[in-house]
Amino acid sequence: MADGGAEPPAPPSSINAGEFLLSILHGSPSPSSQGPQHHQSFALDPAIAAIGPTVNNPFPPSNWQSNGHRPSNHNPPSWPLAFSPPHNLSPNFLGFPQFPPSPFTTNQFDGNQRVSPEDAYRLGFPGTTNPAIQSMVQQQQQQQLPPPQSETRKLVFGSFSGDATQSLNGLHNGNLKYDSNQHEQLMRHPQSTLSNSNMDPNLSHHRNHDLHEQRGGHSGRGNWGHIGNNGRGLKSTPPPPPPGFSSNQRGWDMSLGSKDDDRGMGRNHDQAMGEHSKVWNQSVDFSAEANRLRGLSIQNESKFNLSQQIDHPGPPKGASLHSVSAADAADSFSMLNKEARRGGERREELGQLSKAKREGNANSDEIEDFGEDIVKSLLLEDETGEKDANDGKKDSKTSREKESRVDNRGQRLLGQKARMVKMYMACRNDIHRYDATFIAIYKSLIPAEEELEKQRQLMAHLENLVAKEWPHAKLYLYGSCANSFGFPKSDIDVCLAIEGDDINKSEMLLKLAEILESDNLQNVQALTRARVPIVKLMDPVTGISCDICINNVLAVVNTKLLRDYAQIDVRLRQLAFIVKHWAKSRRVNETYQGTLSSYAYVLMCIHFLQQRRPPILPCLQEMEPTYSVRVDNIRCTYFDNVDRLRNFGSNNRETIAELVWGFFNYWAYAHDYAYNVVSVRTGSILGKREKDWTRRVGNDRHLICIEDPFETSHDLGRVVDKFSIRVLREEFERAARIMHQDPNPCAKLLEPYIPEDNNGQGHN
């Protein structure tokens, strides 16, 4: 025995049970005699046997504890734990019915034995209205005597004897008033079950609360619930969630993610918005809370229709999705934009590829050759150069390099000393004169409501087409049409999110292109050989173009982040609109030509406003997270309750004209291109060495470094090469010079770029 006590004697058959009980109380043992046994028997204190029935327990008794450990104040009984009462006692000893001896060995579960309500709950039987249990009740009422000992019993896990059921029925009006079917529905559909069932939700809540308190106030390791690890690895019913949360249990792996992803995100709790908002203790498992958030969003999934995502972009809270690489997506869109804007033979070939392949009329060699050309064009510059060298084409350059050097831009950069002098120049005194002009330009770039309505019309149409073919696929809106930085006549960017590693994305895209063409959508082009398959189309009814890609989910999350930043301070949208308009006018907004994307320029504006003193924008990813999704191994979390931050930048009184001047002054003279990395994620400047983005021999990629907020290994400036970086910096210097000294800076700043001709004309 664990406590060193001696085993009490078994009751003799020659005395009655009352004398035996008195002998135990007076400490005078009586001689015992045991008859022949046909099965393994265990000693049992008859006083304990008289109090209530027992159950054959297939598990070690220590594992019944909620946390898998024996409490410190728990002393083992002075008798061996018995699994069946002595067969020689009176059938109705002390008025309680007794069991016949079990014919099964102790490692088997006697399905007809009686259990206490607590044992029933631990075994996973939440109620007593199960039809199987009720049938057993009726059988016990009809059979007054227990079955003969020689009768073979069926070993059915979960069945009870009549007395055990009666014991549970004694609590029927208490805190066990729901059956197993209701319990299963509660776990799958918590809100609908509570609203449609006739049970009192407070009863089940009190039941779980009482058991939680009895078990020490915690549920053991991980998500194992009240009974802990019971030796079989089964999960018990978790405690009910608080109002507004779902009980779906899918789980996240908190160990995933890179070191960069964990900065400012390693918190083990989440916050729900609304009437029932509550900050969870760090001991609560983050995966459970995230899945509750996911369930809450799924219940309101109609909110996330494609046309409604213009105002509410992003995956629902708690979603766990798969995404392609941001770098691969950028390469593919760069290629598609290049082909779409160049026009001519290449564009026609691109558009005919998908149609010929779908109809089966294309020559396989021609398709393969064209596919190799596309893939080759998406390779990194050094990889392309290496292939050309191997093929004996040493004089070959990428088309992007050729297009970025159509004139002599980039030859007029200032020296280091001149930049240092200009970096400390004060802003012009009359800068506020141009605020109204910049505001007017900003307002003229906002899409009209009629255009937004046309976009919604096209989105609803696309959603219906996709739902017919892939009912389980999700469509997400991303890009400028949803992040609040879109211009008039901007394309719509749609992500077709579908799970499954066995899905052939290229074939799926070809099928989608076929569906779109059959619905009379025009200019349907499919880029299937790129890293990220894309379909481009134009709606003849609305005149709006649309790009559809597969599983570019990270861009969807980034879209929500940008929109949330835009809600904090209107000066972000004003500055970003001016900068984007400048970049398009000056032709430094084409990634296939080695310049930056619109997304990169918006991140540059956000970072610039984070760095103002006092700051105009906070760093949302460094704040307590209220929004969480997982995209592959990247945990995307940040504070999205931006309504509380509307006055964050009120202490900074800089106007839009001052900010435009300061933005170009920073990127022309103050930014250290050799060592610095712009990081919106941290709201600070990082070093290239910290990111391992140092310049390497044969690779001039990290010349202007802009970190993606979530896929932190992705440098949005990697498209910039050693030629286009000079063009960019020269344009920044031109803009800073105009903002500092030009008498009409608003008009001069946004003058369209005109390439020089053979006579040297142009290049204003």
UniProtKB/Swiss-Prot annotation:
Its cofactor is Mg(2+); Mn(2+). Changing P618L: In urt1-3; Decreased catalytic activity and relocalization to the nucleoplasm. GO terms for cellular component: P-body. Keywords: Cytoplasm, Magnesium, Metal-binding, mRNA processing, Transferase. Residues 217-231 have a biased composition (Gly residues). Its main location: cytoplasm. GO terms for molecular function: metal ion binding; mRNA binding; RNA uridylyltransferase activity. Pfam families: MTPAP-like_central, PAP_assoc. Coiled coil: none annotated. Residues 656-714 form the PAP-associated domain. Residues 54-76, 190-201 have a biased composition (Polar residues). UTP:RNA uridylyltransferase with a marked preference for uridine polymerization and a distributive activity for the first added nucleotides. Uridylates oligo(A)-tailed mRNAs to prevent 3' to 5' ribonucleotytic attacks. Reduces the accumulation of oligo(A)-tailed mRNAs. Prevents the accumulation of excessively deadenylated mRNAs to avoid siRNA biogenesis. Uridylation repairs deadenylated extremities to restore the size distribution observed for non-uridylated oligo(A) tails. Can prevent the 3' trimming of mRNAs still engaged on polysomes. This is UTP:RNA uridylyltransferase 1. It comes from Arabidopsis thaliana. The gene is URT1.
